[in-house]
């Protein structure tokens, strides 16, 4: 069985930090084609997106038209692994989630539901560290609304993660999602060894 774990949340909720923590120390192979992704041959996981210094990693680092490649790619019978990991806004859309289901994937959506004040502090710290401007609140509000709408529409696949520290988020995620548990514990998820 193929399983996908997609991490969503408003800007500054900790999506990139969480995914980087889940995959820390794994040997990595980066690819640009057919879609920007990282293959972790040991333990056998694909992470969609790219890592960039200063934030905006994951699927946010992909082309605006990434969905046109991602949709058929996850339905390809030659997909290199049975476990998929992704975070970010770019592919957090109904069309991609439906493509995963249509391709035979079990979908798990981890919603990082942190207080807006904490997310704002993190965004400010990220902007200061990168020497960039703070994201406009109207844009952040739009992203927050998009996430809330997505979570509402896909509620049967959503696991709410409400803790604030990365370590507690991982613990809560492991408790709620068999895919996350497989990633963290190095267990087997229905035939896929990690």
Task: Give the positions of each predicted feature.
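Short hydrophobic/aromatic beta-strand immediately N-terminal to the Walker A/P-loop
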Residues: 4-8
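Well-ordered, non-membrane alpha-helical segments in soluble/globular domains
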Residues: 63-75, 93-96, 133-148, 170-176
């Amino acid at each position: 069985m193929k399983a996908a774990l997609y991490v969503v949340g408003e800007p500054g909720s900790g999506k990139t930090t969480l995914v980087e923590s889940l995959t820390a120390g794994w040997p990595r192979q980066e690819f640009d084609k057919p879609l920007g992704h990282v293959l972790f041959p040991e333990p056998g996981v694909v992470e969609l997106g790219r890592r960039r210094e200063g934030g905006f990693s994951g699927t946010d680092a992909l082309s605006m038209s990434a969905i046109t490649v991602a949709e058929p790619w996850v339905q390809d019978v030659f997909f290199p692994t049975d476990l998929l990991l992704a975070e970010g806004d770019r592919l957090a859309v109904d069309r991609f989630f439906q493509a995963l289901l249509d391709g035979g994937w079990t979908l798990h959506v981890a919603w990082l539901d942190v207080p807006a004040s904490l997310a704002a502090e993190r965004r400010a710290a990220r902007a200061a560290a990168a020497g960039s401007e703070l994201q406009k609140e109207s844009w952040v509000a739009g992203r927050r609304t998009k996430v809330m709408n997505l979570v509402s529409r896909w509620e049967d696949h959503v696991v709410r993660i409400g803790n604030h520290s990365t370590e507690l988020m991982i613990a809560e995620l492991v408790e709620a999602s068999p895919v996350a548990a497989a990633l963290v514990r190095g267990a087997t998820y229905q035939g896929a060894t990690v």
